[in-house]
């Protein structure tokens, strides 16, 4: 028996086992829209406050006059190679949809698909522990789940939350004159592309993990503010895609100020060097006709604005007089990069960036 025979096989990088990663592996918005058009329209349920009609973040079902259930699911393939971090990021991303509806999570179920004969069991266990650690931080149990043997690693959660029916925040309720506030910096997709190309240094990796594992807990408090009209989170369709959902839902124009957008460090330089995800182009192809980019924006603007965010920030549409309270709510929970990025105005359902 040779020495080579005794050498255990190398554990593959998680990102090498998937064709996409994080929210960048979502079905392209144009394809998804076409698929949903072919689905059977759902029956009418009077207590279903939020369903599939407006591309919102989660379903909401009213139990009584005082309480409604928020239900969502989110899972994806690895965006990083560290299994514990992958679990943390996926869980944080899944819980975000509950917060984006103004809800408070109460429990989660794990959704697990793993190539059992490829990954060591300890690697898979570390992914699960990562997700459990985030749920513990959110104060909820992982109360069960489902697992399959799959070709690519997949992990996420089905998350359940509660909200008062009067505090449900939809992505279709913005008003003309509302100010847009973004909770987290942008550029996660770019950094994940750099990681896959072995171009991301330790500092870049640390900032990517820090932002993607920060729970969007201010959502429930924001929903209680009287001046907050609409709420969503920025994920796989990029800032433009999710801002356009606000605009379409309200039949308004969203104006975004490019110079006010917060970016993660080095993302503009990466894009200038051609480092970004394929999802960016798919996003633009799906909704670019409803976006106006002003002349004079930097050449990297389109790729950055369509960059898919994994576990991205909350996007708030609020009355001007509520801006200080919204920013204070973010700051109190450590969202130091939260920023005013634009406003909603009368006009066609589109996004204007200047």
Predicted region positions:
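A generic local secondary-structure boundary/capping motif
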Residues: 47-50, 58-61, 96-100, 132, ...
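N-terminal glycine-rich phosphate/pyrophosphate-binding loops that anchor nucleotide-derived ligands
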Residues: 2-100, 175-181, 185, 330-336, ...
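Glycine-/charge-enriched secondary-structure boundary and capping motifs
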Residues: 1-20, 31-34, 46, 116-141, ...
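Glycine-rich anion-binding loops of enzyme active sites
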Residues: 63-80, 85-88, 104-200, 342-343
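Active-site glycine-rich loop that binds ribose-phosphate moieties when present
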Residues: 158-168, 202-224, 297
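Short pre-catalytic strand/loop immediately N-terminal to key active-site residues, enriched for Gly-Thr
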Residues: 84, 204-211, 229-230, 300-304
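Small-aliphatic-rich amphipathic alpha-helix that forms the alpha element of a beta-alpha
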Residues: 83-109, 126-137, 214-226, 234, ...
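Acidic-glycine-rich active-site phosphate/pyrophosphate-binding loop
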Residues: 59-70, 213-219, 285-295
């Amino acid at each position: 028996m040779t020495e080579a025979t005794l050498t255990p096989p190398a554990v593959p990088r998680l990102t090498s086992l998937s064709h996409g990663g994080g929210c960048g592996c979502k079905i392209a918005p144009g394809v998804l829209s076409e698929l949903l058009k072919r689905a059977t329209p759902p029956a009418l349920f009077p207590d279903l406050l939020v369903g599939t009609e407006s591309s919102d973040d989660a379903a909401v079902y009213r139990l009584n006059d005082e309480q409604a259930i928020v239900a969502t699911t989110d899972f994806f393939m690895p965006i990083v190679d560290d299994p514990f971090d992958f679990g943390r990021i996926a869980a944080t991303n899944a819980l975000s949809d509950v917060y984006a509806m103004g809800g408070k999570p109460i429990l989660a179920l794990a959704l697990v698909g793993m190539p059992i004969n490829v990954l060591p069991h300890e690697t898979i266990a570390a992914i699960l522990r990562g997700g459990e650690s985030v749920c513990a931080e959110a104060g909820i149990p992982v109360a069960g789940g489902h697992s399959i043997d799959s070709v690519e690693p997949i992990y996420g959660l089905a998350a359940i939350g509660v909200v008062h029916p009067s505090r449900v925040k939809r992505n279709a309720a913005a008003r003309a004159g509302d100010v847009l506030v973004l909770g987290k910096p942008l550029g996660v997709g770019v950094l994940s592309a750099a990681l896959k190309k072995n171009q991301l240094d330790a500092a870049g990796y640390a900032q990517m993990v820090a932002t993607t594992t920060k729970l969007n807990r201010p959502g429930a408090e924001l929903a209680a503010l009287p001046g907050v009209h609409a709420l969503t989170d920025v994920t796989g369709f990029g800032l433009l895609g999710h801002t356009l959902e606000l605009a379409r839902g309200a039949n308004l124009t969203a104006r975004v100020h490019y110079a006010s957008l917060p970016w993660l460090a080095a993302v503009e330089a990466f894009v200038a060097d051609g480092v970004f995800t394929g999802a960016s182009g798919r996003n633009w192809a799906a909704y670019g006709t409803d976006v106006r980019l002003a002349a004079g924006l930097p050449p990297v603007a389109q790729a950055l604005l369509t960059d898919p965010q994994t576990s991205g920030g909350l996007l708030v549409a609020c009355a001007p007089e509520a801006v200080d309270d919204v920013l204070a709510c973010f700051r109190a929970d450590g969202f130091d990069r939260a920023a005013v990025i634009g406003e909603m105005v009368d006009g066609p359902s589109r996004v204007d960036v200047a």
